[in-house]
């Protein structure tokens, strides 16, 4: 097992990374009160719920469960209310812990519930997908979607602990594993050229589900994110770099309908669009652009999206949370392994980069 810490002063918390982790031992110091609400989905209820219920009962905890349907399209106000209903029906108080057992959707919703129930209760993250292990479970961003934009309603809520168990990735469908690799590739492109080389060497093993390689990828990804979050918790500056590919990607997700494409798939194509624009601006070479496309393709991820009318694509981009004073800001690549956030780019070049990476209209 490897351990990282997100350094946030008195809110410092650990990330445990390994296989066959023991929840009873690892969670014991971090669950403050007796009451624990496990929030999970219908898929994970069958796979892992009993394991964690048993561990919590062994710690003499009062356990209740809220099971939500599985999928991004359920990340909305109606299903968030089901968590509040469960907390209130169980009679839980402000010393309770909300434990997220699931991927990014469950983590985002359970975290938002923990941030808002009785103005804030304890929160624990047990991410069960690669994407949530390397990204959404770390850093405290929580929230739900709105028909006009992804993650538009939410709060910052840091967990007490994150427990990433590689053995749970065995049950992950290949498409979900690939979606998680999009966020892993993101960390390499935005800040670590050596990590990009490591991914190029080991991509076949990662796709095959090698737990040792996956643990290393999760550790290196979380180390990047933990450092950035410690420096910029509320995304006033450097943390926005973690949105490489996301402005384009969120537009793709919003247009196609949440859940039609997985988040990681949309981010993958979004990163290609960002790299394409960076190339058009003269910042990266054509070889760098091809290298970006190749590593994304090797992870079995898309490098183009279905045809989307340009005016609608741009409209969704205008709802992005990085828009400041009416100006769109993009995360682009100054070089491979070095990203910047900028509002200085040629809009016509941006439009060309979007259109060039859509599947043929014919």
Curated annotation (Swiss-Prot):
GO terms for biological process: amino acid biosynthetic process; aromatic amino acid family biosynthetic process; chorismate biosynthetic process. Keywords: Amino-acid biosynthesis, Aromatic amino acid biosynthesis, Cobalt, Cytoplasm, Lyase, Metal-binding, NAD, Nucleotide-binding, Zinc. The keyword S-adenosyl-L-methionine does not apply. One of its GO terms (molecular function) is metal ion binding. It is an enzyme of class 4 (lyase). It catalyses: 7-phospho-2-dehydro-3-deoxy-D-arabino-heptonate = 3-dehydroquinate + phosphate. Its EC number is 4.2.3.4. Pathway: Metabolic intermediate biosynthesis; chorismate biosynthesis; chorismate from D-erythrose 4-phosphate and phosphoenolpyruvate: step 2/7. It is found in: Cytoplasm. Binds 1 divalent metal cation per subunit. Can use either Co(2+) or Zn(2+). The keyword Metal-binding applies. Pfam families: DHQ_synthase, DHQS_C. Belongs to the sugar phosphate cyclases superfamily. Dehydroquinate synthase family. This is 3-dehydroquinate synthase.
């Amino acid at each position: 097992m490897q351990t990282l810490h997100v350094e946030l002063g008195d809110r410092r918390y650990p990330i445990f990374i390994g296989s066959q982790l023991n929840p009873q031992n690892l969670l014991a110091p971090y669950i403050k009160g007796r009451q624990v609400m496990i929030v999970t989905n219908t898929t994970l209820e069958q796979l892992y719920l009993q394991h964690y219920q048993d561990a919590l009962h062994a710690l003499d905890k009062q356990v209740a469960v809220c099971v939500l349907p599985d999928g991004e399209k359920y990340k909305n106000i109606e299903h968030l209310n089901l968590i509040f209903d469960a907390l209130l029906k169980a009679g839980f108080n402000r010393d309770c812990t909300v434990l997220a057992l699931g991927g990014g959707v469950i983590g985002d919703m359970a975290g938002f519930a923990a941030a808002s129930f009785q103005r804030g209760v304890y929160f624990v993250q047990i991410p069960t997908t690669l994407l949530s292990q390397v990204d959404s479970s770390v850093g405290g961003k929580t929230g739900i979607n709105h028909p006009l934009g992804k993650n538009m309603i939410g709060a910052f809520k840091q967990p007490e602990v994150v427990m990433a168990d590689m053995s749970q990735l065995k049950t992950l469908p290949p498409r979900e594993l690939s979606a998680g690799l999009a966020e892993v590739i993101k960390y390499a492109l935005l800040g670590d050229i050596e990590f990009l080389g490591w991914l190029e060497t080991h991509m076949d093993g990662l796709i095959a589900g090698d737990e040792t390689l996956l643990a290393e990828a999760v550790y290196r990804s979380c180390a990047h994110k933990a450092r950035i979050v410690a420096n910029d918790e509320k995304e006033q500056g450097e943390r926005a770099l973690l949105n490489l590919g996301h402005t384009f990607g969120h537009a793709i997700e919003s247009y196609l309908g949440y859940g039609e494409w997985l988040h990681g798939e949309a981010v993958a194509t979004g990163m290609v669009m960002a790299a394409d624009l960076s190339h058009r601006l003269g910042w990266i070479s054509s070889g760098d652009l091809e290298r970006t496309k190749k590593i994304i393709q090797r992870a079995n991820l898309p490098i183009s999206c279905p045809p989307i009318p340009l005016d609608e694509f741009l409209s969704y981009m205008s709802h992005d949370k990085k828009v400041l004073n009416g100006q769109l800001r993009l995360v682009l690549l100054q070089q491979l392994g070095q990203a910047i956030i900028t509002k200085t780019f040629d809009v016509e070049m941006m439009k060309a980069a979007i259109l060039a990476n859509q599947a043929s209209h014919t």
